[in-house]
Amino acid sequence: LSRRQRQMCIRDSPRIIDHPEAIETITYRELRELAYMGATVLHEDAIFPVRQEGIPINIRNTNAPEDNGTWIVGSTCQKSKYVITGIAGKKGFCSVNIEKDMMNSEIGFGRKVLQAFEENGISFEHVPSGIDTMTVFVHQDEFMHKEQKVVAGIHRLANPDMIDIESDLALIAVVGRGMKSTRGTAGRIFSALAHKNINVKMIDQGSSELNIIIGVA
């Protein structure tokens, strides 16, 4: 970790963004979302006991203890001046794209597809779907040497019309408790990606609106 990272949590990777802004306050949920996508500040095992007891954590730099650092809390009413708390990303994913006419009316279709992954010991990351389509995002290194078995399992269990696989994808997590109360955040995110000619493959936003996961090629 750089000195800046040891001092406090930052909003972006210093390997990508010059002089990233510091995070003054972050919730445990926000930190977990960012850590899951590769942000390395504190290991989950290190914060689990104090999180369970609702004890806040203050990260400071031992070389500059007078600085405020970053507070990690269970919840906060403090309104951040930033809509987005942090951004993290991870490479090495692939998507298994499945199509079948009238898929939406077939009871248990999603379960059958995921069963093929379970039988081969592969966990999934995200499962966006449409009326006749379903996509399963998985770690590429876990999937590629079991690809034929998984595809055969999907055909056997779900009988799809088509299966297509895309590799070398990345997932970006945009995390922030302020996104829920701010209109147009997603639009600005996608405008920034389009401005850099980045092809968006998947969008996944939970009902909590705490984060937006974007799959890119």
Predicted regions mapped to residue ranges:
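Polyanion-binding loop/helix "lid" in catalytic or ligand-binding cores
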Residues: 7, 14-65
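Single conserved hydrophobic/aromatic residue that forms the stacking wall/gate
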Residues: 1-10
